[in-house]
Curated annotation (Swiss-Prot):
Free-text disruption phenotype from the record: No visible phenotype under normal growth condition, but reduced responsiveness of hypocotyls to light and increased responsiveness to brassinolide (BL).
GO molecular function (one): iron ion binding
Descriptive protein name: Cytochrome P450 734A1
Induction comment: By brassinolide (BL), auxin and dark treatment.
Keywords carried by this UniProt record: Growth regulation, Heme, Iron, Membrane, Metal-binding, Monooxygenase, Oxidoreductase, Transmembrane, Transmembrane helix
Length: 520
C-alpha cells in the first residue's frame, strides 16, 4: 500500500515541479529578461531612459517626483510642466525628449517630436488607443473613449449628429438657461459692496453637469440628471482609489470606498436601463419632446433609434459622455477664468468685444458666438497653457518604423501634450506667457508647426465633443463678462494638478464684482 501511494506521489511532485519551473521561467522572462532586451533594442538606436528595476520599473521614482511636485502650491506662473508632468520634465533633461520609461514591466516611449506625433495620429492602421486602466474605464465607461475598430466607427457615426454645428446652435438656449441660472445665484449672494467670492471650479462642475444632462438625455433630462449625480459620487470614489493604483489588486479589495463604488455602479446601470426603456416606450407611443420641431438631437434618442446598438452600449456611452463632457468643459472654464483674473488687460479686451457684439443687456445668441473672436483667442491660449488632458498614449499594433526608429509590437507611446504646448521651439520665447494674440490669425498660424496645438487630440480620434465644449465656454464667459469684473480671491493657491485631467488642487476661489452702469 505504501509503495502504491509513493508511486503516485512522485509523479505529482514532478508535475508540480515542472509547473513551478515554467511559472518561474515565465516570470523571469516577463520581469527581467524581456525588459533587458527592450532596453538593449532601444539603446542601439540612441534611446535611453532611467534603468529598469525588477518588477516595479521606475514607478518608485516616478510617484516620488509627482508627489513632491504636488506637495505645495507654485508661484503665479504658467510654466506648469515641471509640476504636472514632473517625471517627464526631470528625465527629459537627462535623456532628451525621446526616452524609455517603465511602469512596472510595461515600457513606454515618450514622443514629443511633432513630426513623429503627426505620424502616430495619422496612421491608425499601425497605432491604436491604449487600453485604459480598469479604474479609468469604470469612470469613463466602455464607450467611444475606449472602443476600437468597427464598433468605435459605428458608435461615432451614430453619435456625431449630436455635435454637428447646426444641432449645437439649437442647444444655445439650453446652455444660456443653465448659465443665467448660475450667475443669477451669484448675484443673489452679492454683499453690500457688490462683491461675492465663488469657487468657480465647483460651480462650473454643476453647470456643465446640467448642460451635459440636457444634451445627453433631452426630454428625459430630469431622470438623466439623477443618474449623473450617482456618477458624480462614483467619480469621487474612483479618484480616491486611483491614488492607490500602484497597489496590485487594490480595486478588488472590499474597502469601504470600493464597496460603495460597486453599489453605485449597480444603481447607475439599473437607473439607466429604466430610463432607456421608458424613452423607448415614449417613442413607440409617439410622446415626448422628440416629436416637436425643431428640437436638438440628443445622445440617448440617437442611440435608441440606431441599429446594432445594445442597451449595454447605451449605458456605457452615457457614462463616457458624462465623464468627458463634464470634466473637459468645466476645467476649460475654470482655467480660463483664472487666466482672465490674472490678466485683467485681456479680461477688459474680452469685455469690450462682448459689449460691442452682444450689448450690455442682451443675452448672447447663436449669431453672436461666431463674432466673439477675442474670446476664441483667449480660449485657445487657455487650452495651450492648461490642456485638460496633459498626455495621451498610443500602442503599436505591430512592429513598425516611426521616423527612423524601429518600434516593437506592443510598445506604448506616451505623447506629452503639455510638453508640446510648452515647447519654446514651437511657440517662441514667450511660450510660458499668456498671450492670446498669438492666435489672432487662427490656430494654423499660431505655432511654428501644425501639430504644435493638440488639446483635443489629432486624426480620426479627435475629440467628438470639442465644438460643444467651446460653445458652452464662449456663452458662459460672455454672460459672466457682461455682468461682472473678477479677480483672484486672496485665498487662491496656484496648484495645477493631474488626476486623469488637469485641475486646480485647492479649488479656484474668484472674487466677482457687479459691473456698474458707469463701467458699462
Amino acid at each position: 500500500m505504501e509503495e502504491e501511494s509513493s508511486s503516485w506521489f512522485i509523479p505529482k511532485v514532478l508535475v508540480l515541479s515542472v509547473i513551478l519551473s515554467l511559472v518561474i521561467v515565465k516570470g523571469m522572462s516577463l520581469l527581467w529578461w524581456r525588459p533587458r532586451k527592450i532596453e538593449e533594442h532601444f539603446s542601439k538606436q540612441g534611446i535611453r531612459g532611467p534603468p529598469y528595476h525588477f518588477f516595479i520599473g521606475n514607478v518608485k521614482e516616478l510617484v516620488g517626483m509627482m508627489l513632491k511636485a504636488s506637495s505645495h502650491p507654485m508661484p503665479f506662473s504658467h510654466n506648469i510642466l515641471p509640476r504636472v508632468l514632473s517625471f517627464y520634465h526631470h528625465w527629459r533633461k537627462i535623456y532628451g525628449a525621446t526616452f524609455l520609461v517603465w511602469f512596472g514591466p510595461t515600457f513606454r516611449l515618450t514622443v514629443a517630436d511633432p513630426d513623429l506625433i503627426r505620424e502616430i495620429f495619422s496612421k491608425s492602421e499601425f497605432y491604436e488607443k491604449n487600453e485604459a486602466h480598469p479604474l479609468v474605464k469604470q469612470l469613463e465607461g466602455d464607450g467611444l473613449l475606449s472602443l476600437k475598430g468597427e464598433k468605435w466607427a459605428h458608435h461615432r457615426k451614430i453619435i456625431s449628429p449630436t455635435f454637428h454645428m447646426e444641432n449645437l446652435k439649437l442647444l444655445v438656449p439650453v446652455v444660456l438657461k443653465s448659465v443665467t441660472d448660475m450667475v443669477d445665484k451669484w448675484s443673489d449672494k452679492l454683499s453690500e459692496n457688490g462683491e461675492v467670492e465663488v469657487d468657480v471650479y465647483e460651480w462650473f462642475q454643476i453647470l456643465t453637469e446640467d448642460v451635459i444632462s440636457r444634451t445627453a438625455f433631452g426630454s428625459s433630462y430630469e431622470d438623466g440628471r439623477a443618474v449623473f449625480r450617482l456618477q458624480a459620487q462614483q467619480m469621487l470614489l474612483c479618484a480616491e482609489a486611483f491614488q492607490k493604483v500602484f497597489i496590485p489588486g487594490y480595486r478588488f479589495f472590499p474597502t469601504r470606498g470600493n464597496l460603495k463604488s460597486w453599489k453605485l455602479d449597480k444603481e447607475i446601470r439599473k437607473s439607466l436601463l429604466k430610463l432607456i426603456e421608458r424613452r423607448r416606450q415614449n417613442a413607440i407611443d409617439g410622446e415626448g419632446e422628440e416629436c416637436k420641431e425643431p428640437a436638438a438631437k440628443d445622445l440617448l434618442g440617437l442611440m435608441i433609434q440606431a441599429k446594432n446598438v445594445t442597451v449595454q452600449d447605451i449605458v456605457e456611452e452615457c457614462k463616457s459622455f458624462f465623464f468627458a463632457g463634464k470634466q473637459t468643459t468645466s476645467n476649460l472654464l475654470t482655467w480660463t477664468t483664472i487666466l482672465l483674473s490674472m490678466h485683467p488687460e485681456w479680461q477688459a479686451k474680452a469685455r469690450d468685444e462682448v459689449l460691442r457684439v452682444c450689448g450690455s443687456r442682451d443675452v448672447p445668441t447663436k449669431d453672436h458666438v461666431v463674432k466673439l473672436k477675442t474670446l476664441s483667442m483667449i480660449l485657445n491660449e487657455s487650452l495651450r497653457l492648461y490642456p485638460p488632458i496633459v498626455a495621451t498614449i498610443r500602442r503599436a499594433k505591430s512592429d513598425v518604423k516611426l521616423g527612423g526608429y524601429k518600434i516593437p509590437c506592443g510598445t506604448e507611446l506616451l505623447i506629452p501634450i503639455i510638453a508640446v504646448h510648452h515647447d519654446q521651439a514651437i511657440w517662441g520665447n514667450d511660450v510660458n506667457e499668456f498671450n492670446p494674440a498669438r492666435f489672432a490669425d487662427g490656430v494654423p498660424r499660431a505655432a511654428k508647426h501644425p501639430v504644435g496645438f493638440i488639446p483635443f487630440g489629432l486624426g480620426v480620434r479627435t475629440c467628438i465633443g470639442q465644438n460643444l465644449a467651446i460653445l458652452q465656454a464662449k456663452l458662459t464667459l460672455a454672460v459672466m463678462i457682461q455682468r461682472f469684473t473678477f479677480h483672484l480671491a486672496p485665498t487662491y493657491q496656484h496648484a495645477p494638478t493631474v488626476l486623469m485631467l488637469l485641475y486646480p488642487q485647492h479649488g479656484a476661489p474668484i472674487t466677482f464684482r457687479r459691473l456698474t452702469n458707469h463701467e458699462d
